[in-house]
Amino acid sequence: MEPIRFTPRQTLLAALLAATFCTPAMASKAVSWEDILNDDKTTGDVLSYGLGMKAQRYSPLTRINTKNVDHLVPAWSFSFGGEKQRGQEGQALVHDGVIYITSSYSRIFAIDARSGKRLWEYEARLPEDIRPCCDVVNRGPAIYGDKIFFGTLDASIVALNKDTGKVVWKKKFGDHKIGYTMTGAPFVVKDQKSGKMLLVHGSSGDEFGVVGWLFARDPDTGEEVWARPLVEGHMGRLNGKESVTTGDAKAPSWPRDKDGKLVDAWNHGGGAPWQTASFDVDNNTVVIGAGNPAPWNTWHRTKEGDDPRNWDSLFTSGQAYVDASSGELKGFYQHTPNDAWDFSGNNSVVLFEYKDPKSGKLIKASAHADRNGFFFVTDREKLAKGAGYPNKPTSLIGAWPFVDGITWASGFDLKTGKPIEKGNRPPAPKAGADKGDTVYVSPPFLGGTNWMPMSYSQQTELFYIPANHWAMDYWTEKLTYKAGSAYLGQGFRIKRLYDDHVGTLRALDPKTGKIVWEHKEKFPLWAGTMTTAGGLLFTGTSDGYVKAFDARNGKELWKFQTGSGVVSVPITWEMDGEQFVGIQSGYGGAVPLWGGDMAELTKQVTQGGSMWVFKLPKSLKN
């Protein structure tokens, strides 16, 4: 795998355009913590990634509903312009009549929500030697006070004045030359103990062999408050000083060489929390998915001659529970111990409550649809307690397959919290060979689902998962770490699982694991979902449609062709007595870069880069 590189012309253009383009705008009111905390309840704005602290992506709006959604029409469309298109995976924010949206190549725009007019634009000056593994995407900004925040592909995070787009501060958190980058949206929380506001964000770069970090900063200055590595035995920081190691300082879940030192893979161990967190306010806990271990090759993280199942490669490919005050890892549930398939664990961890069908007790839970093909429900109270060793496999409540044809495991043991493996790990190369024997794996490393966030409906009490059916041929390869180069030790070829579809949108009951309904798509699904109190589910498709479904039964009620693949996340808000739905269009992401047969399938999808906003005609608004 080669990193994406810039041509000299692209670099010159970036230098010329990096200055902010600005149309003077009226100063809007500052965003408070109370505004952000109530984002899931208020309807006139969208102030957080996930539409609330719990990341449920559920809106209480009802003006657009199952009875009238088929009348939706475009209000306006905004082009991101220039030659830079690629994948548009962002989720927009809305505040005081202004939309804030990021786009490919580390750009951010402020747009008048009523007219679609650009108010200002900022484009980061990106060096030629950035190393994003999976396209030059950006998944969105955060907002607080008078500032808007977003990450850039050169491993930096930037704060801009939300009214002018002028840079307030910029902080670099890693060396982009060796693989550190940032694609996820930052997240604003309030430490419930100290009262301090925190800007929380992760790093990316597992595929280049870097240790993943989760950071918390002062949103006013950008100064680091704490930093937490997600590889066991690595040291964290608090207020600029060393704090405590992550887990056991001896890192017993990683093997040692004959010289007694930890294996080299431990130095490059991955675990990057590159997606966006949710926040358990009651427990003052940042909840986030941890990325895959590095390298992918399981044998580099296993003691020679031993069983990989004895070496978990903590704290990777799971869900992490971090104390907002100290940055210490309180709890962890690992979806894929000693992950050999790049199943990662980054996609959203959604916080929700339900009544236990047997006892009637209210359960405070977390839900996660993993790339490994299983849907997990965990006890977030147990995971946030912070007692003893952080790894808490017995926090598992349920684990059910949400896609077909899973080859690596038959299920999970609820007593131990561990997977019941089926012997699907690719063997190491034999003596004298450059690669190992090929195994057939489903889902492939692109996952049963991937980064695209699922949603939860408080009406139906179902989760809505943008999933895919596919597989891969998979084999180990010889590997030596080289800074700035891909650090995988695996070869692969993505293949079809079924002839009639790849994408499958599925509604799942988290109390039973039952698939209530599904909708199939020819192309891979790579967009997130959103539900509303109007009984609707919104998402996008790789062949260019924005679609609305009846959340109860999966009936397709409306669609609109945007002209390019939709691989972003929908939002909704109300303004001037009308409800609006917004989403980005612009095909890209990991599938066309890494997708094998899937990349060939989607060649016909045209490039693009735009923001679309929809509403009901005036005659139907009431």
Task: Please identify what each model-predicted range represents.
Residues 29-74, 244, 423-430, 494-495, ...:
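Blade/loop signatures of beta-propeller domains
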Residues 46-50, 85-107, 132-156, 181-207, ...:
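Repeat-blade elements of multi-bladed beta-propeller folds
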Residues 55-174, 532:
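N-terminal cofactor/phosphate-binding cores enriched in small/glycine residues
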Residues 78-93, 121-142, 170-188, 208, ...:
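Extracytoplasmic beta-rich repeat domains
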Residues 160-161, 165, 212-224, 306-326, ...:
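Beta-propeller blade signature
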Residues 184-222, 340-416, 429-441, 446-450, ...:
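Repeat-solenoid scaffold signature
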Residues 467-469, 497-555:
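Loop/turn-rich, solvent-exposed surfaces of beta-rich toroidal or solenoidal domains
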Residues 571-622:
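Blade-level signature of beta-propeller repeat domains, shared across WD40, Kelch, NHL, RCC1
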